Amino acid sequence: MPHTADRSTAAWQDLDRQHYLHPFTDYKALQAKGARVIVRAEGVYLYDSDGNRILDGMAGLWCVNVGYGRRELADAAYRQMLELPYYNSFFQTAHPP
């Protein structure tokens, strides 16, 4: 998988145009200007492929209200992934949270 810096904004927009259907989108406008390509995030800010810093007021659709780049959360998720990333609760099974 290429690193974001390995492609131009136009190249990422072209891939996006070919392979993704954006929800709640004016497709005529999207075709005219292309998608904003978000390449990284830190704290409450997003950064696009053109280097613009953008305040993420919607917290990634309210999924990252604690901010981006929180090392302690990434470490906790890593430890959990090593122990038990997922198991279903069908067939009378349970697991600790």
Language-model-derived ranges and their functions:
Residues 35-56:
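Active-site and channel-lining beta-strand-loop segments
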Residues 2-41:
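Active-site-adjacent loop/helix segments that line or gate small-molecule/cofactor pockets in enzymes
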Residues 18, 22-25, 45, 66, ...:
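Intrinsically disordered, low-complexity segments enriched in small/polar residues
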Residues 14-16, 45-49, 70-76:
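Short hydrophobic/aromatic-rich motifs at helix boundaries and adjacent loops
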Residues 2, 6-9, 53-97:
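Glycine-rich loop-to-alpha-helix module at the N-terminal edge of alpha/beta enzyme cores
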